[in-house]
């Protein structure tokens, strides 16, 4: 929260117009990124990755312009996270403003960590010659064993950082319709958003969920068609058989990870919309239908880890929603009949998702579940080969993004499997970042999870927040045995959910 202070430069009408242009451009660009990211084959190719990078940098520039107008020229646009007239910043030690500043500092520290690792590189790997070219480096600073891959990692995550902070700043801004009551009443309005959520957040969640539902439908049709062409267009270099891929993702587990991140968000969003609208309008049930399709997709994809995570979130999410429905006071405008129907719809959602998954995926998934122990044994052998890397470079690691090239030095023979990803993001992060970089990541995630308990911000409905936490927890659990955080579209969605959480508070 910015403190009121005399502006350094006078505010002009053109500045206000420029601010609104930047806000509108941020919204449109963000919507493009939400749709583009998964459909562009999961953003796994250089052309799609750099499209997202440039879009992220553009969001960063737009954010810098907005912060400049607010900070240097004293512009105070109506925002849901701004204190009302006569109200000071929230009291207490744990405030949203302090956590936001701490997370901003951690973001800069992480980017600096990666940048120093690339600039202070100890080696560059030449793929044409399969050899390392070693350089002098400062040993007590982070350093990379493949400068090229670490630079790629830096540019990608600079774009993600810009996107994250642009979304954090854009979401609590008020739309024109939300600003009008402020103008009419001279600012004396409630700071609680209509329909329980601000309009921009509702718009973002609608787009995420409907886009995810369409993505899921395409993936199901593609699996039934069985040609092995991603989006019916391209045959990937790896996983060319239809059962190994799903939708635009060449690896079925990545598709499952994306859907398991998104469908709990849709379910929580539907619950909030149902509570606010009841049965006066029925359009919000499209959110439930899209979430149902997405919840079935991890099972249909035949990803073993994805199916287990789906089942876990379904059980925990349903138990939580039903329990809180009966334990806490109902919505004042909700009748007992409407409450019962809502619970019936929730239970029906779970049963329908499992039935849909069973109908289209169980026949292929069952043999893979019976071989789960064998699959884990194979991965544990790779983990055992990789663990000495973490032991040899415990503090700074081998450098962000360098696992692929450094792992070859630890293979027992040329016959040893040489993976591009370790299929264990927890261990790979420990190897490439060391405990120093890993601590920064853990602190940043901790700040996001603590944000809801801090004072100040947008009212965050308890049920929606818990389902967002479950979505993040499911992705983190799956990361123990796979590589969701090596896929840009999944990481982008993970950060979008974190940006939403960074605006929520149980005590605005």
Where are these regions (language model features)?
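Alpha-helical transmembrane segments of multi-pass inner-membrane proteins
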Residues: 2-20, 24-43, 50-64, 104-124, ...
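Transmembrane alpha-helix boundary signature
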Residues: 65-97, 113-131, 137-142, 148, ...
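Peri-membrane helix termini and adjoining interfacial loops of integral membrane proteins
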Residues: 74-84, 125-138, 227-241, 326, ...
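Interfacial helix-loop-helix linkers and transmembrane-helix boundary segments
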Residues: 94-99, 197-200
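Extracytoplasmic loop-helix module adjacent to an early transmembrane segment
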Residues: 128-136, 374-393
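Soluble non-cytosolic domains of exported or imported proteins
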Residues: 158-161, 377-380, 401
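TM-adjacent membrane-interface loops and short helices in multi-pass inner/ER membrane proteins
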Residues: 251, 380-419, 426-429, 433-440
